[in-house]
From Swiss-Prot:
Pathway: Amino-acid biosynthesis; L-histidine biosynthesis; L-histidine from 5-phospho-alpha-D-ribose 1-diphosphate: step 6/9. GO terms for biological process: L-histidine biosynthetic process. GO terms for cellular component: cytoplasm. The keyword Amino-acid biosynthesis applies. One of its GO terms (molecular function) is imidazoleglycerol-phosphate dehydratase activity. Belongs to the imidazoleglycerol-phosphate dehydratase family. This is Imidazoleglycerol-phosphate dehydratase. It comes from Paracoccus denitrificans (strain Pd 1222).
Length: 195
């Protein structure tokens, strides 16, 4: 069973995450940050990972802690659900077009966290959501999920489209990487003998 449940509690946030890598993309995400919920829904739908998030944070300050801590918890849940990573494809990449936006994501479930982020936004906010929090989410996801992640904006004029294309591109790359590879059943996808 490639499932996980994580609870993270700090003085700033209380987060619960449940995910199923072998899902159908079902989602039920409630963080108190509307645009972020919309992005998490995209992440689930397009990765085919079932995802449920419940978050309560210090939104009276801003959205930062809620977004970052949700990324931490989802990353931890991914690590738990993947186990020793035997039999997975490990790598994934995708170019995602959404209207004016074109974003490329490539990732390696290597247990070596590293984020390369080449995504600029033409606006600092999408509604009330700070666009810089998109990077914060993926930094937390990469670090706590042990993911080498590259995300590049190739084109884009609209901040909402760019952010959504980034989440969808990462989702499609993740879908590929977590997929069981029948030719590698029970085999670790590394010559090192460990990931």
């Amino acid at each position: 069973m490639r499932r996980a449940k994580i609870t993270r509690e700090t003085a700033e946030t209380q987060i619960e995450v449940e995910l199923d890598l072998d899902g159908t993309g079902r989602y039920d995400n409630r963080t108190g940050v509307g645009f972020f919920d919309h992005m998490l829904d995209q992440l689930a739908r397009h990765s085919l990972i079932d995802l449920t998030v419940r978050a309560k944070g210090d939104l009276h300050i801003d959205d930062h802690h809620t977004v970052e801590d949700t990324g931490i918890a989802i990353g931890q849940a991914l690590t738990q659900a993947l186990g020793d990573k035997r039999g997975i494809r490990r790598y994934g990449s995708f170019h995602l077009a959404m209207d004016d936006a074109l974003v490329r994501a490539a990732l390696d479930l290597s247990a070596r966290p590293y984020l390369v982020w080449n995504v600029d936004f033409p606006a600092q906010k999408i509604g009330t959501f700070d666009t810089e929090l998109v990077r914060e989410f993926f930094q937390a996801l990469s670090t706590h999920g042990g993911i080498t992640l590259h995300v590049d904006r190739i084109h884009g004029l609209n901040a909402h489209h760019i952010a959504e294309a980034a989440f969808k591109a990462v989702a499609r790359a993740m879908r590929e990487a977590v997929e069981p590879d029948p030719r590698m059943a029970g085999v670790l996808p590394s010559t090192k003998g460990a990931l």
